[in-house]
């Protein structure tokens, strides 16, 4: 954990270094996207000399900052509605997809050994299931020795797109969770311990015996955390990996959804991972500085065209080229400078 935390902060510092210029982009928001955004930014700076200062502050913070025009772009794992985009003069588009996974700290339990269902996960986070050897969990894991240990549920303390994806899934599979708690970036969890960012949730789970949390998959893998299998929409137990994320993403109807606002949780398909989602970049339609907006779009275009292999290394799914064509057409139509001229 210490090594990964240090690498995150070192990358953040490196991304922020450089002389201020029109080519130094600023962004803020999603911690879900941070591992791949950092990787892309380092490679892009090596290729072009242009830098990115990205703050991993959570999707809610990213939305606030782009609305306040304090950054060149925000990033959120919860898409804004068409009405909200229109109201605030914003445009959004997906940049990457990935998976959210339940992670646990249980002695002797290895990655992928524990099986959970959506309704059991919902009951844990509603505080209804309190012990790891509870009958509801034991029935799903007859070959696994579960301790008589109290469950500590860990959640996000900040406004979070990862929370939105997790709570969206739980709301779809548990009517009680949907009624009492619902899907949101700022979930009012009835119990448990909060952590700031995916980093904070991962750290809390690692330090608390008996803890369960939810993080983007790259954080689980980098920190060697024990993640669970989940029973998906088709009743199949699946492991989180690039193939199961791709299976869930395959049904995304980007071309038919206003504002590209696709939510891919609980997708049908025998191989689909049930908590899959996208990160969306959000920008002002009318840019105060057209040069900076153009540089952001150049960075994203480069990432779409050159970043797929880097994304796959971290188990993210690149946006298909057919969808990129649609996205870049939106750039031309909607992103303008202060004189009303197309930036792209």
Predicted regions, residues:
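Flexible loop/hinge segments at secondary-structure junctions
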Residues: 22-344
């Amino acid at each position: 954990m210490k090594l990964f935390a240090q690498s995150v902060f070192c990358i953040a510092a490196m991304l922020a270094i450089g002389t201020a210029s029109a080519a130094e982009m600023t962004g803020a928001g999603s911690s879900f996207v941070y591992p791949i955004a950092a990787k892309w930014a380092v490679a892009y700076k090596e290729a072009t000399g242009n830098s990115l200062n990205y703050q991993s502050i959570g999707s809610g913070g990213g939305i606030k900052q782009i609305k306040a025009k304090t950054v060149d772009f925000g990033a959120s794992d919860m898409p804004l509605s068409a009405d909200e985009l229109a109201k605030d003069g914003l445009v959004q588009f997906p940049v990457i997809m990935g998976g959210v996974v339940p992670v646990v700290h249980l002695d002797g339990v290895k990655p992928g050994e524990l099986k959970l269902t959506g309704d059991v996960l919902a009951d844990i986070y509603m505080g209804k299931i309190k012990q790891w050897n509870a009958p509801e969990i034991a029935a799903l894991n007859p070959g696994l020795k579960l301790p008589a240990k109290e469950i500590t549920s860990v959640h996000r303390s900040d406004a979070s797109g990862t929370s939105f994806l997790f709570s969206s899934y739980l709301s779809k599979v548990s009517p009680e969770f949907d009624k009492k708690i619902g899907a949101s970036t700022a979930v009012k969890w009835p119990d448990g311990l909060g952590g700031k960012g995916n980093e904070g949730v991962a750290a809390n789970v690692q330090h608390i015996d008996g803890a369960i949390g939810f993080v983007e998959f790259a954080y689980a893998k980098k920190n060697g955390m024990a993640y669970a299998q989940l029973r998906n929409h088709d009743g199949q137990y699946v492991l989180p990996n690039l193939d199961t994320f791709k299976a869930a993403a395959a049904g995304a109807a980007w071309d038919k959804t206003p504002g590209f606002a696709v939510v891919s949780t609980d997708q049908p398909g025998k191989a689909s991972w049930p908590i899959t989602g996208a990160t969306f970049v959000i920008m002002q339609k009318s840019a105060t500085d057209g040069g900076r907006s153009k540089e952001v779009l150049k960075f994203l275009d480069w990432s779409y065209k050159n970043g797929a292999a880097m994304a796959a290394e971290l188990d993210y799914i690149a946006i298909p080229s057919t969808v990129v064509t649609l996205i870049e057409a939106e750039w031309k139509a909607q992103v303008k400078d202060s004189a009303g001229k197309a930036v792209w």
